[in-house]
Design a protein with these regions (language model features):
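RNA-contacting regions in translation and RNA-metabolism proteins
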Residues: 1-223
């Protein structure tokens, strides 16, 4: 381990993990066994050098492929991933088989599958698994999880959408330092604007006094 760089000797090849490919806050001690994703191979005079990563989206894809055997059979698949390593990952999944719940398949019984992935990347990194939708408005609404969305209007030409939420959901939709809406935007490919809608005030009619109602009824009968 060198300052800001993790270096791994692999026979004739050398693997390095730059700081940009590391999970923020993660400590790599000498002799520690870790899983990595081979992001690139650079050819040098001394031989090939492997660029390793634990902080990119492909690493999360690899980890789920180890935990979800249905990915190998093609029953379920990861459509898109957006990640800010060490903080949050959003995963859009789908199924090609009717009756198969893709989200439940990736979460696993009692959350065992997603928990195994979180154990590797660090439990401080939240993982949102959402169903992929071909309809952009539906997909955007799903991507805004955990916020509850009222409606979405999409401008296909501008690749922009407005997401309407109730006032109490606005901060959830935006997320800490804009993280939730930022990841949702990357996941869906649309620039997203969050608009809060005030709760509609119900028009309540004044309750009539029961004695007045009885008197009115008596008067009508008398007439």
């Amino acid at each position: 381990v060198e300052p800001r760089v993790v270096r791994v000797e692999l026979g004739k090849a050398t693997g390095i993990m730059p700081q940009s490919e590391q999970i923020p806050g993660e400590y790599y001690g000498v002799g520690r066994r870790i899983k990595v994703y081979i992001k690139d191979i650079e050819r040098e005079g001394r031989g090939p050098q492997l660029i390793l990563s634990r902080g990119n989206e492909e690493f999360v894809h690899y980890l789920f492929s180890q935990e979800v055997p249905e990915m190998e059979t093609g029953a379920v698949e990861i459509k898109k991933i957006a990640r800010e390593a060490g903080r949050r990952t959003k995963l859009a999944v789908s199924s090609v088989l009717p009756g198969v719940d893709p989200v439940g398949t990736f979460v696993g019984g009692h959350g065992t599958r997603v928990q195994a992935v979180m154990n590797e990347i660090g439990e401080q990194e939240k993982v949102d698994i959402i169903p992929y939708e071909d309809n952009p408005a539906d997909f955007i609404a799903n991507a805004m999880s955990p916020a509850e969305v009222l409606s979405v209007t999409v401008d296909e030409e501008a690749k922009r959408a407005t997401v309407y939420v109730s006032e109490d959901q606005q901060s959830v939709a935006i997320g800490r330092a804009g993280q939730n809406v930022r990841l949702a935007s990357r996941l869906t490919g649309y620039e997203l604007d969050i608009e809060a809608k005030a709760a509609a005030k119900s028009e309540t009619k004044p309750r009539k006094n029961i004695e007045d109602s009885l008197m009115n009824a008596v008067e009508e009968v008398a007439e």
